[in-house]
């Protein structure tokens, strides 16, 4: 049944992607300025709550020059109020991500966060057929970067800038790239909070890009998504990512994305005080 739904989705992906993206832009333009920052395709500068443990599982139906599925499971740890650690696997390779939030500014119904991050993907696979630096577990990659996130009322925007490098590469394609994203999120429900147990509905539009430092190509993807949060702990995401600009030879450049997250508060032991 899932395969049938995905086939219908891909047959209509051009019309659906343009229509969905246009709908979200229209909604963002006409609703009051409000915010949310739990992005579907990128990470904000805000770290996980201290002493929390999160688990995430996602499924991607990917298409383009070829079709394939990608399953991914990740464990997330809020080591402190400033440091988060993520460990993940796509069952063909493993990755680690650490984030350090070094700046925080809070105001009434608003805040600003700045963070550094580092990421490493390790796999036996080698994507020698593409010039792009792939971040979905198809090749071993290391990277570092910077994230700036600002929230105001129920609207949040985030900018990330990073450098990524393949561990193995072909001389014909190069080895490193400049990675960037610009993400926006809007909380559309509830209109007014009465408890932490209320269901939240968020809409997102993210731009995800890469410029090869060898000068041999670049891409820019758009990724609209909808998100539901239950009891401030469980999160269901549904998104679609597609290419706006494609000047690399990626084998897959569009995907239907579904993920489920669950967060356990105060799951890690408190630090002992001397």
Which residues does each predicted region cover?
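Cleavable N-terminal export/targeting peptides
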Residues: 1-41, 265-274
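Transmembrane beta-barrel domains of Gram-negative outer membranes and organellar outer membranes
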Residues: 35-159, 163-167, 172, 177-274
